[in-house]
Amino acid sequence: MTTKVTIQDIANELQLSRNTVSKAINNTGVLADATREKILRKAAEMGYKQFAYLPLFQEDAAKTAAPSILPSDKREIAMLTTQFLSSSHFSSTMLDRFQSEINHLHSGMTIHRISPIELKEKKLPSSLNIQRTAGIICFEVFDYDYAQMLCDLDLPLLFVDSPVMNMRPPLKADRLYMENRIEIQNAVTHMVQRGKKRISFAGDKNHCQSFFERYMAYRDAVEHFGLTEGLSTCAMPSGQQNYPVSLYETIHRFKTMPDAFVCANDFVAMDLVKALNELGYSVPDDIWVCGFDDSQEASYFAPRLTSIHIHGQIMGYTAANLLMTRIEEPSLNYRTVYTETNLILRESTGD
């Protein structure tokens, strides 16, 4: 049986701290480029799960790059998004890896923001040259009708997360998600084992498919433990306008506060902690809070936020693989792929 390589194993080999190795592998924190490269090389050499099969370090990449599968006049991969993606969003790490992978195939990436008017009128961004576009990757495109319009273009298409798909016809495109259920249920289990009985959810479950899956995982978990009282104190205001205010107003109306909240993502969790503080509650002394994404802010927020880590590097590699194989074999059945996530326990749940 093959022994699983851990971050600690890599740290021991290099005589570095586990924290330093973790920063390099998860692309968080500040490290010297030479240190980061040394760690990643060792991780690949030892067969660490995230890098064991990835061509991270090719000598003379220009010479060893694979031949392009794209025609010379159609070499662009277009990224469409409705939001400005910050460096703390998991997509930042993911896109770095995605772009690195497609560059090996002599392809380039262009980024196009869908304006509110274009979204409403179901129009492509004016900056997009469809004649030069070999494929499209979508981030934060959660309007179902707009997504259907993109599918009708009959171009290779990948959604990273998607509109809520519950009770809707499937999109004619590949879809990539982070694993949303297992670690949410592990977080609820951790709370129950530590004596929490009234556990609620915070976040708009209809914002996107991932939020919906996280809510359903939470609900299944509390029903499994017979702790359904928390369902009545879920904080799920919809829409994005003045969300912190809406969240505050929602929990302000609660006659009984939960013992703990599971949140749709870290930014909902941080808004929730601030709202609870304004109402006189302390996290974690009075109420526990768990986020999702393991954003950079989670580790230096006060209190440090328990969260669920998304592996941006492996998502970027998987995204490139899905889109390029779709370009090469357009007749493939549509694929839905999930990548691993991990629960990270910190101060906001008493850890």
What are these regions (language model features)?
Residues 89-105, 183-186, 209-229, 271, ...:
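Short, solvent-exposed amphipathic alpha-helices that sit
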Residues 185-227, 335-350:
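An alpha-beta-alpha
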